[in-house]
Amino acid sequence: MQPSPPPTELVPSERAVVLLSCALSALGSGLLVATHALWPDLRSRARRLLLFLSLADLLSAASYFYGVLQNFAGPSWDCVLQGALSTFANTSSFFWTVAIALYLYLSIVRAARGPRTDRLLWAFHVVSWGVPLVITVAAVALKKIGYDASDVSVGWCWIDLEAKDHVLWMLLTGKLWEMLAYVLLPLLYLLVRKHINRAHTALSEYRPILSQEHRLLRHSSMADKKLVLIPLIFIGLRVWSTVRFVLTLCGSPAVQTPVLVVLHGIGNTFQGGANCIMFVLCTRAVRTRLFSLCCCCCSSQPPTKSPAGTPKAPAPSKPGESQESQGTPGELPST
């Protein structure tokens, strides 16, 4: 039996980059949860699914942060605990990501409405929380989670490479669902985009007002960009983990390449940050309210005093000015 290769060593700069990625992902996931709590009128079914994805990403970022901070050098109880939490959260994140794409496909292309979508949401909960939980509990009970020498991770613990069937458990605890998502996400979003483009083409023949048509095209263009970017961002983040997984199976020393290690660390930990960029910072309805909230917090300072010592009175507002400055929630586009 050949001796196992030395573990992948992480230099402080690599750990710092991955820790920063974990922190930004946790911040982004927390911001998504906060926007859901602050504005009830924005709680559509799709954004409700995004809330559960954000919770999974938040737990994933926290568990990865602990793993990278500890940089485990061998098996221990907290290595198993961290590996179990990250396995559950990471697998759940895969399921919720596909669930959002499937929901958009069924609601837009198949026009699913009413009780049917309610049953669908319950099914998403059962699958997206239940399946990862069963897999994780089984992996812990069978002692499959443990130290992996950072060959298929970046400092954190996952599947014990000493287990005889470690490849099977790597597939069950993440890689199988990851590779299925590579196929399902582009396929579902492509079908949704084709349906939307077909509908816009049909509607354009009956829109005589050019300004409305221009606004429709502008909003649909932003939606089309998102439908393309969502699967591309997911694949762009996760592919480095898959590459190192394949290199580990092949026994290639390239698995320890520093650039590949850093990309793997960022890709596995930054999903929450990427979702925040897409669905908060690049969604005008949420971005406008968030910036307004920040401006209100910054402007809520005590009134300045005039040289005479009396506080300056605020300038009287013009009639109708306050109504013009406040847009109704329904007027804010979701793109």
Curated annotation (Swiss-Prot):
Q: Name one GO cellular component term.
A: ciliary membrane
**PROSITE patterns reported in the protein's UniProt record:** G_PROTEIN_RECEP_F2_4
Q: Where are the transmembrane segments?
A: 16-36, 49-69, 88-108, 120-140, 167-187, 227-247, 259-279
- Which keywords fit this entry according to its UniProt record? Cell membrane, Cell projection, Developmental protein, Differentiation, G-protein coupled receptor, Membrane, Receptor, Transducer, Transmembrane, Transmembrane helix
Q: Name one GO biological process term.
A: adenylate cyclase-activating G protein-coupled receptor signaling pathway
What role is this protein assigned?
A: Orphan receptor that promotes neuronal differentiation of radial glial progenitors (RGPs). The activity of this receptor is mediated by a G(q)-protein that activates a phosphatidylinositol-calcium second messenger.
Origin species, per record, is Homo sapiens
State which gene encodes it: GPR157
Tell me where in or outside the cell this protein is found. Cell projection, Cilium membrane
Write out the ranges of the annotated region (Disordered): 300-335
Gene3D superfamilies, A to Z: Rhodopsin 7-helix transmembrane proteins
Q: Which PANTHER family match?
A: G PROTEIN-COUPLED RECEPTOR 157-RELATED (PTHR23112), G-PROTEIN COUPLED RECEPTOR 157 (PTHR23112:SF47)
Q: Which family does it belong to?
A: Belongs to the G-protein coupled receptor 2 family.
Question: Extracellular topology: which positions?
Answer: 1-15, 70-87, 141-166, 248-258
Residues on Cytoplasmic side? 37-48, 109-119, 188-226, 280-335
Question: What residue spans carry the Polar residues bias annotation?
Answer: 320-335
The membrane topology noted for this protein in its Swiss-Prot or TrEMBL record is: Multi-pass membrane protein
Which pairs of Cys residues are joined through disulfide bonds in the record?
none
What is the designated name of this protein?
A: G-protein coupled receptor 157
A single Gene Ontology MF term assigned here is: G protein-coupled receptor activity
